[in-house]
Amino acid sequence: MMEGSRQTRVSRPYKISESSKVYRWAEHSGTVLQRLNEQRLRGLFCDVVLVADEQRLPAHRNLLAVCSDYFNSMFTLGMREAFQKEVELIGASYIGLKAVVDFLYGGELVLDGGNIDYVLETAHLLQIWTAVDFCCEYLEQEVSEDNYLYLQELASIYSLKRLDAFIDSFILSRFGTLSFTPAFLQNISMQKLCAYLGSSEVQRECEHDLLQAALQWLTQQPEREAHAYQVLENIHFPLIPKNDLLHRVKPAVCSLLPREANCEGFIEEAVRYHNSLAAQPVMQTKRTALRTTQECLLFVGGEVSERCLELSDDTCYLDAQSEQWVKETPLPARRSHHCVAVLGGFIFIAGGSFSRDNGGDAASNLLYRYDPRCKQWIKVASMNQRRVDFYLASIEDMLVAVGGRNENGALSSVETYSPKTDSWSYVAGLPRFTYGHAGTIYKDFVYISGGHDYQIGPYRKNLLCYDHRTDVWEERRPMSTARGWHSMCSLGDSIYSIGGSDDSLESMERFDVLGVEAYSPQCNQWTRVAPLLHANSESGVAVWEGRIYILGGYSWENTAFSKTVQVYDRDKDKWSEGTELPKAIAGVSACVCALKPRLEDKKKKGKGKRPQDHGQ
């Protein structure tokens, strides 16, 4: 090599891989921002000066445009400010501007009672939504019974959906107290009042309290009477006892509001509802509905394994928060191997056995109805035939009782119950005697599968479909596994046939079936899915919050009752164990229905709610 020449490449004594690797500077963005902030504080390389309240803040256009839609538009769309060395921000305070600019450079926003109004105003003006969101989070911590109306007005001025939703939750959880305060009655808007009165989350002792709050608001100012109909249509008058409607509510409404308000019609509607006791399930409107957003998983009745108890009259629901089974109003009579259906927000219990011998001799034809609004059971029209080990469907505005058995043996008859007439009528029967089968509803069609036709012999694989519009039963593709005393339910686009038992052809001994198969009505095809963890003959079944729940049951091989709850996750095709039942039980029914919330539950629910919406 010539003397004085530069070596341009190091000679490699060993070979180095030609594959590339990426190395990341983890602190890069933080370091860049820190150095930019240091330059800003020293006035280095700043190309714009922001002016507010005649005070100046140097900054870098590039960073402002990256962090703020407001500045991005100002500096890129040819506005005159793009060429000015100083930009005056009308409507921004220096206190707010300095806090926001410091936040853009340092990532930290200092908020306190002295600057929050200024910072919120400036952040909203400059469209720096992360800062606005932090302001909302700060204000949520400060909401109190003294300032909630001011903060609600602030949320309205700046269209702060997150803060507005939080204050709504704050008011709803304390409505019973706040709604009678002078500040609320004088300042709350008609739109907000209607939203609160129409909410399922509103805290109150009873519906009458909401009516009183509405009447107090309406009578505060004469011009509000024009809004009486809009306000009172949110009161669930049918939830008020009939005696109170006639002797307290009607006189109050008539004396406080002019006839032109047309509000007496709400009371008349509620009285008609109370007078039509049996028809109530098919008279449902928004005003007859319970004020709740959640449905509960329940089990009713059953045969328990403990001595001296035998049959149960328990009605229990699962408290999702405590994961405990809580007792609701018990059945009027002990029952097992009955059926349950929900219609119009009412729970119906039909048939079943009134003794531990459920062979059919103790079959019942009684129909009980539970109203969660008043937590009461009543007896309505009995079925034409006594039935045990049958299926009860709820479809449109009627119930359908399918097959079963009684003291005369297996049944093929099918009958429907009309709440409107409080009567049962026979419809097209099954093509064969059937009991110990299972059923479900899918898109207004009744499906039943399996079961026995006579006392002796193996169970069936058949699947039948009933169209109530044409009153016709049709055969569908049979299951791959014969079964009886099993469970059926519909979830998504599939019908599931779950567990049960069968009799051995050789020994005639009964054995447990753990297999589960899913049926596609569109394809008329069965597919095997994950099997059960435990035997489940004569168990309760319900679909709750997108999962299948199997409650209790009986194992023929182990001759044992079960208190296990098995839960199926369709997405994972996996069974797991849920909260155990209080007792080992079989011949139990399960359903999902909205229940009247306990007052303490509503108070718990109302506290600490923090909506996570975007803070705009």
Curated annotation (Swiss-Prot):
Q: Where are the Kelch repeats?
A: 296-345, 346-397, 398-444, 446-493, 494-546, 547-595
Keyword Disulfide bond applies: no
Quote one Gene Ontology molecular function term. Answer: cullin family protein binding
Q: Which CDD domains match?
A: BACK_KLHL36, BTB_POZ_KLHL36
Pathway per the UniProt entry = Protein modification; protein ubiquitination
Taxonomically, the superkingdom here is: Eukaryota
Q: Entry's SUPFAM superfamilies? A: Kelch motif, POZ domain
| InterPro entries reported in the protein's UniProt record | BACK, BTB-kelch_protein, BTB/POZ_dom, Kelch-typ_b-propeller, Kelch_1, SKP1/BTB/POZ_sf
* Domain BTB: start-end pairs: 46-113
Domain BACK, first and last residues per copy? 148-250
**Physiological role:** Probable substrate-specific adapter of an E3 ubiquitin-protein ligase complex which mediates the ubiquitination and subsequent proteasomal degradation of target proteins.
- Quaternary structure? Interacts with CUL3.
Question: What PANTHER family has UniProt attached to this entry?
Answer: KELCH-LIKE PROTEIN 36, LD33804P
What is this protein's record name? Kelch-like protein 36
Biological source species = Bos taurus
